[in-house]
Amino acid sequence: MNIFNQLKQDIIAASRQLYNNQEIANIVTIETSKDNFNGDLSSNIAMIIAAKENMPPRTVALKFKEILITLPYIASIEIAGPGFINFTIKAESWQIAIKNILQHEGKFFEIDIDKNKYINIEYVSANPTGPMHIGHARGAVYGDVLARILQKVGYNVTKEYYVNDAGSQINDLVSTVLLRYREALGEKITIPVGLYPGEYLIPVGQILVKEYGNKLLVMDEEERFKIVKNFAVEKMLDLNRKDLEELGIKHDLFFSEQSLHDKGKIEEIVKLLTNMGLIYEGTLPAPKGKIHAKWDNRVQKLFKSTKYGDSQDRPIEKADGSWSYFASDLAYAKDKIDRGANHLIYVLGADHSGYVKRIEAIVKALGKEQIKVDVKICQLVNFIENGVPVKMSKRLGNFASVQDVNHEVGKDIIRFMMLTRQNDKPLDFDLVKVKEQSRENPIFYVQYAHVRTVSILSKAMELMPESYSSFEAGIYDLSLLSSEEEIDIIKLLAAWTKTLEVSAKYFEPHRIALYLINLASKFHSIWNFGKENSDYRFVIENNKELTTARLALAKAIQKVIASGFEVIGVEPMNKM
C-alpha cells in the first residue's frame, strides 16, 4: 500500500459519496505536514469542495472527517485553519512501507499519474563551435534527469539536441578552422578578435591537411566553405557527443537546424502563417536604451507574436534577406508537433529567458492549444577553483570544459552537484569542496549512507547469521521499529514515490537530490545515536528480533538511495 495514493483514493471516494463529485481526481492534493504537531499528511479537499458547493470549508471538512476517521490506517484527524484536514497515520501503516519496498518493489515505485503524453524535451543544444564548458553541464544534467523522471513515471519521452549549424557563429567557426588549416600548411597566422582562439581547433586544421593537402586553397570559395563547414560541425558535434556521453547523457535525436533550410521547412511554415494573416511587413520600435539614430528602422517581415502574449512581434528575416533564427524556431516547433509530440519542453540557458513567450506564441499560432509548452531556464554556474572564479568563454579560449572537470572530479559528482539547487537559481560549483569527504559535501554524504547500509548487512551476515537469514527470508517484525527516529525515517522512505511524482509534475529534479540528502541525514543521525547508545545500533548481538527488523530498515534505505541515484544517473558506492 502506498499511503499517499491510498489516502487520495479514499478522499476521492468520500467526495463522490458526499457530493457526487466526479471531477476532483486531478486537483485534490496530499501533502506531507511540515511538523508532527499538524499530523502526518494534509489535504485541501474541503476548500475545493466548499468553493464548488458554496459551503463553509470547515463544515465540509467535518463531513469528510466523519467518513475518513473510520479508515483502518487513520489514527486521528484534525481540522486546521480555514479547512485543511490533517491526518495522523497509524505507526503500523507507515511500517508496512518497509515490506512494500523490499517485497513489492515494483508496485511500491508505481505512480498513479496521467500517462497519455508524448513529451519532446530539448536540452543542451550547445552551438557546435567547440568543447562544452561546465556551464552547459547544468542544462545537460537538468534535462537528462528530468527526462529520466518523466520516463520513470510512465510518460513517452524523446530527448532531443537541436544542432545550431546554420547561424553566424558557424561562419566564424569556418573562418577559424580555415586559419588553422593554413597554419597546418606552415603559414603563420593570427586569430582575429571575434573568432575562436582555443587550441582545440588545431587538430581539425591538421586533419583537413591530411585529407585535402593544399587543395582547399585553390578551391571555389562556396565549395570550400561547404566542405569546411560540414567537416568542422561534424568534428565539434562528435566532441560534444563524447563530452555528453562521459556525463552519462545520450540523446535520442540530434536535429540539424540546417536541415530545416535544406528541406524547405521554413518556407513551408512562413507560407502557412502568411495565409493565416500572421506574417506582415512592418517596422519594430527601437529597443529601450538604444540610440535611435543608430537603429535600423527598416521595413521587414514580422510574425504577429504579440497576438499571443509576446512583448513584441518577431522578425523572420535578417537584413541580408536570409531567414532569422526565429524563423527556424517556427519551423522546428512545427516539426516536433508533426512528429507526434503533445508536450514540448525547452531547457534553455539564462541568456534565453526572453524566449518563453516567443515559443508559446509559435505553438498557439499553429492552432495547437492542446499542445502544452514549458520553457525551463537554467541559471549560470559559478565555477570556482581554489576560491578564484573561473571565467568561461570559448571566444577567449579560457574556459573550464566539461571534459576537464569530468576528468578532475568524475561524472557522478558533476551530475549530483548540478541538482543541489533549483534550476532557476545560480549555482556555485566549488572544485575543492566537491572532493571533500565531509558532511559539507552532499554527494559524499549520500554515498556514505549507502556504503554504511552495505556495511551493516555485511556485519550482520558475519556476526548474526541467524538474524540475517530471517531478514533474507522476509521474516521480521516491523512493529519493533517504533522509536521516534525510526518512524521518522520510515515516513521519509514512504514519501519516495511522492517525491518522484512531485518532481515530474513541477519539472524539478533538484527535489530528488534534496530528498536523498535528507534521507542520508536522518540515517546518519540514527547511526551516530548508536555510537552513544547501543539500543540504537542496527546490529545488536543480544537482540535477534530487533536486529532482523533493523536489517530490513537498512536494506529499504539502501534500495531507495539506489533508486534515487538511478534517476540522477549516479552509481551507488558499496565501499569507500
From Swiss-Prot:
Motif ('HIGH' region): 126-136
InterPro entries xref list: aa-tRNA-synth_I_CS, Arg-tRNA-ligase, Arg-tRNA-synth_N, Arg-tRNA-synth_N_sf, ArgRS_core, DALR_anticod-bd, Rossmann-like_a/b/a_fold, tRNAsynth_Ia_anticodon-bd
Main location, first listed in the record: cytoplasm
EC top class, as a word: ligase
One of the GO biological process terms: arginyl-tRNA aminoacylation
Subcellular location, record wording: Cytoplasm
Family per similarity comment: Belongs to the class-I aminoacyl-tRNA synthetase family.
Name this polypeptide is given: Arginine--tRNA ligase
Organism of derivation: Rickettsia canadensis (strain McKiel)
The encoding gene: argS
